[in-house]
Amino acid sequence: MKAFAVLFVLSLIKTELRPSYGLPLLQSGLYNTNQIFQKTQTLPPFIQDSNSTLPAPSTTNLPETNKLASHLQHRLSRSLLSANTTTPKTGGELRGLPTDDPWVVAGFVTLGVVAGGLVLILCYLYTPCCAYLVILCCWFKKWGPY
């Protein structure tokens, strides 16, 4: 039970940090694209890239019905029209921290070390290691970043 409490707290922390890194708040499988994105009759203009041809994001394609739709539109526009288009993006790149302030970076590192230490202590004291690893793997599979 304590392991689930720790995983619940980690889920809350992760939910609070997701908007800072530009990640969606819900899993991608929960989005119904027919409700968020409107279908259009016209084809968007294309951006010619050295590796591929990508459709340019159009601001008229997305409804402004709620904050989630406008947030997704903003993130989509920023990801497709990035300044560095010469480097191919494979989807596995690490995202930078949202700020360059060294105190914020030190705070994130400290938070990670403390959370990791608490998980290790709970793993050692309260549950057998094998069972805890199974619980942790299931948690990452369901609520993990991918």
From Swiss-Prot:
Protein's UniProt keywords contain Membrane: no
Key words, A-Z: Early protein, Glycoprotein
Glycosylation (residues): N51, N84
The keyword Glycoprotein appears for this protein: yes
Free-text function comment from the UniProt entry: E3 proteins seem to be dispensable for virus growth in tissue culture cells. They are potentially important for virus growth under special conditions; E3 region may help adenoviruses to evade the immune surveillance of the host.
Protein name per UniProt: Early E3 16 kDa glycoprotein
